[in-house]
Amino acid sequence: MAGHEVQYGKHRTRRSFSRIKEVLDLPNLIEIQTDSFKDFLDTGLKEVFEDVLPISNFTDTMELEFVGYELKEPKYTLEEARAHDAHYSAPIFVTFRLINKETGEIKTQEVFFGDFPLMTEMGTFIINGAERIIVSQLVRSPGVYFNDKVDKNGKIGYGSTVIPNRGAWLELETDSKDIAYTRIDRTRKIPFTTLVRALGFSGDDEIIDIFGDSELVRNTIEKDIHKNPNDSRTDEALKEIYERLRPGEPKTADSSRSLLIARFFDARRYDLAAVGRYKINKKLNVKTRLLNQVIAENLVDPETGEILVEAGTEMTRSVIDSIADYLDGDLNKIVYTPNEYAVLTEPVVLQKFKVMAPNDPDRTVTVIGNASPDDKVRHLTPADILAEMSYFLNLAEGLGKVDDIDHLGNRRIRAVGELLANQFRIGLARMERNVRERMSVQDNEVLTPQQIINIRPVTAAIKEFFGSSQLSQFMDQHNPLSELSHKRRLSALGPGGLTRDRAGYEVRDVHYTHYGRMCPIETPEGPNIGLINNLSSYGHLNKYGFIQTPYRKVDRETGKVTNEIEWLTADEEDEFTVAQANSKLNEDGSFAEEIVMGRHQGNNQEFPASSVEYMDVSPKQVVAVATACIPFLENDDSNRALMGANMQRQAVPLIDPKAPFVGTGMEYQAAHDSGAAIIAQHNGKVVYSDADKIEVRREDGSLDVYHVTKFRRSNSGTAYNQRTLVRVGDSVEKGDFIADGPSMEKGEMALGQNPVVAYMTWEGYNFEDAVIMSERLVKDDVYTSVHLEEFESETRDTKLGPEEITREIPNVGEDALKDLDEMGIIRIGAEVKEGDILVGKVTPKGEKDLSAEERLLHAIFGDKSREVRDTSLRVPHGGDGVVCDVKIFTRANGDELQSGVNMLVRVYIAQKRKIKVGDKMAGRHGNKGVVSRIVPVEDMPYLPDGTPVDIMLNPLGVPSRMNIGQVMELHLGMAARNLGIHIATPVFDGATSDDLWETVKEAGMDSDAKTVLYDGRTGEPFDNRVSVGVMYMIKLHHMVDDKLHARSVGPYSTITQQPLGGKAQFGGQRFGEMEVWALEAYGASNVLQEILTYKSDDVTGRLKAYEAITKGKPIPKPGVPESFRVLVKELQSLGLDMRVLDKDDKEVDLRDLDEGEDDDVMHVDDLEKAREKQALEAAEFANSDEK
């Protein structure tokens, strides 16, 4: 027997074909959401308050300080928030301290700071009763970036940009004349030496001393001449910079100093964030820049006088490691003191080394480091600017390397917590201005924190973010896998990110650093391809928001692969050689072969085993969760795998789902972490279990009660239904499944069913990927799903009086009211069809002025005789089903309703949808198709033992699409069915073709895994042997019931007067330009005329036609289409004298055309005839006169 048994949870065992030992369990798959939000509550929120506060007034006599905050108990529980359309949120109270600096008086007060939405355990938020998700954003990391560009003459130039988290950009660039310029905040460029002089290093010799002598520096100094001898060089430079930043304003050196300080050196206006400081220190650090360069001077320890490194030594990694203390310490730092006119006069600390120029060994190049300022320095320093300029100048000398902006070392993730913190900061900054004004205006003696704080800007910012941000999305709740994928989604779009139109090919492409971090396969098809990605299965964020992936460490001394795990970011991984997870190992953990396949800086090649430093943890670390659920992924073309991964997320939860016979072992983990199942929180014993609740007695004696959700409507209109798995007396452990969620079976993801599938044609019905299906799948409810639709009706106060929900509806027979209760609301359990009343409602009609008698009748008999019209809620087209729930909200019950609404009734209707012709089906390999025919069981082809086939697929769908995985799954699935087992074949480590044939043989199948099939209609065998097996097939959310649509009389667009489009608007089918040509080609002029008039925008004509049809009269001639009037007006707007004439040659106003009963507009030919007739009549008249 090939393979080995693996237990998944308590309810399922699978035979696994994996050969690679798993050394690391998958992390919790939604930790990217939950951990980030927890960090935000623990530290992020506090940091935001500390960033913005304290706030002082303009005279600096009062100060408002932040003390702390506290989240109180949520107003509603999760279920209540869902039921009441409310937020699941907790009130937040912040303690402030107001200090009067003149009197020394201190007032401390707790201020209510609004309700803050809380994250549920599943990583979602409940906003207005619906589950939403905040998608993590993939953005460029703050830091310093260097790039090169080739001009039209083939000359290479260099550029550099410092990108902050917020604040002005600082750019450097070279031009074709080899002069280096700088730009501040995207303004006009100035020679870079101007900025150096403004920093207080004004002499030409001083600049050459700092940066070393190079052609670029000399050329730039020549360009940067001293124009005004009355100013010092620094003052002149400051004025020049001011003129660029504020053109047209009077320039002074002082105003320029304060402007530059505000732009770059003020922590409140310029923020690199922790990640920006880390990236800058890493890039400008001398250790990485000296690596593999030849040092041009002796490195001497100033304390002992010992020569650490002699001139001419190549600085290999081992040499640098040996003098790491010297390079990191203060011994090699040089202090430069700016002149007294500088922007900042504090001394500037740098590190400075001379190395041989790589391009010219006779010259030396100066390398300047920024001496790594502390992590807490979140703004730029003069040392950063000088070190950046040094790196930039070094690039022209062949030293250093340019950055790849698509490298995941340069892109980071902003998860929920950070996005919320940014939003909160925006709100607090708006509040700050408000507070400052109130502090200054009001009387200091009586002020309290409560009086000067207005929380509206903060609550508005949070509300806006959750309600309308591009990253706050309605949760994709088709099935647990789609929930999980949505929570792990990474979007490059959104505020501060890319836009679809601007994103080029490079950003969307797969990059070698995606390995183990972002899935190369799961991304949408269409305009968002490559911009929306998914986190790989083992991906994890570090504190800076870079994605890390785990590797097994290789012991360099013994050469053995250890079980020690290290998490590496993309730029850390670049320094190492990593072996693949499927490299063969000996028992002791050493590599079995001298040469192993590995990766180094994006090169996949063979490496000597001795040079390998890390090894992949698992073969599935490359791909995302949905992709890891595709068996035999390694045998599928990547384009089809992409469709397979995406279509699994569109699977509809079935009534009785089955886990796949051929799985990947990922189904258990995906179901466990999705949040759709009920998982035991503690060890214990089940003491009560039914369909509504499960009670577990813990070991310490306390009782856990779990509520089972039955038939709740999900975001996508499917039934969210949980099924109890445990019985009284079962013992459960923490983390066990105690109830399955939707699309789960025995604690495993179960998106579809395991039908018997044959690859064969049948009467041409599976042309173009269509699917032929047996009626058994309809009768036995194999692919039946339950869908819930929500309808609501509300009563409002109108000008004529309040609307009323009642059973007494005018002109409606008793038969239509049979299922309504005494209030006029449908009973639960009623079967309803299109047009049935769900909620009886009447609205007052406008009343004419009543006579005295009528007023008397009203006074005697009350309001009953008043005129009302029927505005009941009825079942729309395609909405038939069973009423499964009714919710009533009224003011009297304390429900919060919109203003003007007195009562709100919600009715939920459940539909059981069997599979039918036109529904879309798919396998897991991107093999999708539409059901074209449902064949009676007796007509389906059958196997030699009499089993009829369930589904027939077209064999032509396989070769050109290169998704051979489906054929392997088919054979292995049949073997699993015959053996009565479930199989796991993990991605990139699954069943080989030998394993497959061995299992087929064990199952007693033929050696080619094909079989003879018999035609169900004739009983004759088919000519050739057919591949028949079991394939996992899912029913997708694109169902024909939702798409079928017909229009009679419907709404028209106000402007064009043409019917609207689309099912949602009850629109028509567009009859476009090409369709008009088709009818013209057939000469079907009358059909075409009515399509372009009555059925489109002939406003009067269509009314008359409707009237004629209803009264049984002949349909009158069509009138003038609205579009003709538009055409006339457009021609007139071009200055053409366009008029419409009647038969008497009189001009007709287009508006009058529809007034008369008979149209006066004539055809051109008729006009000619009329003129001739007129001429004849005139001649006759003249003759008669003469007579």
Curated annotation (Swiss-Prot):
Record's catalysed reaction(s): RNA(n) + a ribonucleoside 5'-triphosphate = RNA(n+1) + diphosphate
Name assigned to this protein: DNA-directed RNA polymerase subunit beta
Protein family membership: Belongs to the RNA polymerase beta chain family.
GO molecular function, one term: DNA-directed RNA polymerase activity
Entry keyword set: DNA-directed RNA polymerase, Nucleotidyltransferase, Transcription, Transferase
PROSITE patterns: RNA_POL_BETA
Cellular component per GO, a single term: DNA-directed RNA polymerase complex
Organism annotation: Streptococcus mutans serotype c (strain ATCC 700610 / UA159)
